[in-house]
């Protein structure tokens, strides 16, 4: 999305018109709405498939911003039960957005240990912006040896 959320919402709308059942489209559109700060649209988009972990991820972020922290925690619990440590990177972004830097950094370190493919987005992911000045975050970034 490259922080081009309005364009992303429009593009995902086109994709949904072609294939309304493609599960990733609603979750990605939900993240675009989240990036725009349109939390009601993010919620609506991500509630379409409540059993899909991607939607649970989006809802964990969105519910928290809507002041529904217990519901947000329930979504994380569903993710952990369904896919466990394989979503270490996603848990890190959730905790970063919730303001829990220590837990976010722990999950990023776990992501590094398990070689979570989400780490490829570490340098540009806006969900991790709250962590960028943390020495532990910077150490992870150095260890990943991104090109300058």
PLM features: residue spans?
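Alpha-helical protein-protein interaction modules
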Residues: 1-148
């Amino acid at each position: 999305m490259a922080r081009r959320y309005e364009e992303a919402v429009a593009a995902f709308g086109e994709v949904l018109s072609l294939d309304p059942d493609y599960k990733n489209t609603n979750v990605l559109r939900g993240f675009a709405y989240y990036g725009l700060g349109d939390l009601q649209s993010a919620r609506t988009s991500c509630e379409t498939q409540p059993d899909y972990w991607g939607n649970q991820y989006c809802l964990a972020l969105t519910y928290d911003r809507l002041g529904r922290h217990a519901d947000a925690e329930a979504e994380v619990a569903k993710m952990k039960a369904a896919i466990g440590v394989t979503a270490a990177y996603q848990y890190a972004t959730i905790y970063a957005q919730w303001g829990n830097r220590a837990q976010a950094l722990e999950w990023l370190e776990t992501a590094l240990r398990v070689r979570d493919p989400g780490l490829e987005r570490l340098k540009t992911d806006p969900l991790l912006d709250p962590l960028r000045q943390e020495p532990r975050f910077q150490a992870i970034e150095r260890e990943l040896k991104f090109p300058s």
